[in-house]
Amino acid sequence: MASTQPKNDAKSTEPKPEQPVTEKKTAVLEEDDEFEDFPVDDWEAEDTEAAKGNNEAKHLWEESWDDDDTSDDFSAQLKEELKKVEAAKKR
C-alpha cells in the first residue's frame, strides 16, 4: 500500500552549488601539421590476387553501384500506396 505522505528527499531540497562553465577548446590543425602515414605493405608476388587467378580477370567489386532494385515486393507495395495517395489527392 502506498503512503499518502510525500517523501522528503534530502537531495531535492539542498541547493545545488553553481558550477562554472568551462569551455574546452580543441587544437586547431594547420596546413603544415604533419600526419603519420600508414606503413607500406610489401606483398610477395605469390600473395596477390593476380598470382592466384590463372591470368583470368576477376571482378572484385560490382560493376554497377546502383542499389535500386525496383522488382522487390516493398517497391511494388510502395508504388501502389503512392498511386492510392495520388488518387485521394485528386478527389
Curated annotation (Swiss-Prot):
It comes from the Eukaryota. Residues 8-28 have a biased composition (Basic and acidic residues). GO terms for biological process: double-strand break repair via homologous recombination; mRNA export from nucleus; proteasome assembly. One of its GO terms (cellular component) is proteasome complex. Subunit of the 26S proteasome which plays a role in ubiquitin-dependent proteolysis. Part of the 26S proteasome. This is Putative 26S proteasome complex subunit sem-1. It comes from Neurospora crassa (strain ATCC 24698 / 74-OR23-1A / CBS 708.71 / DSM 1257 / FGSC 987). The gene is sem-1.
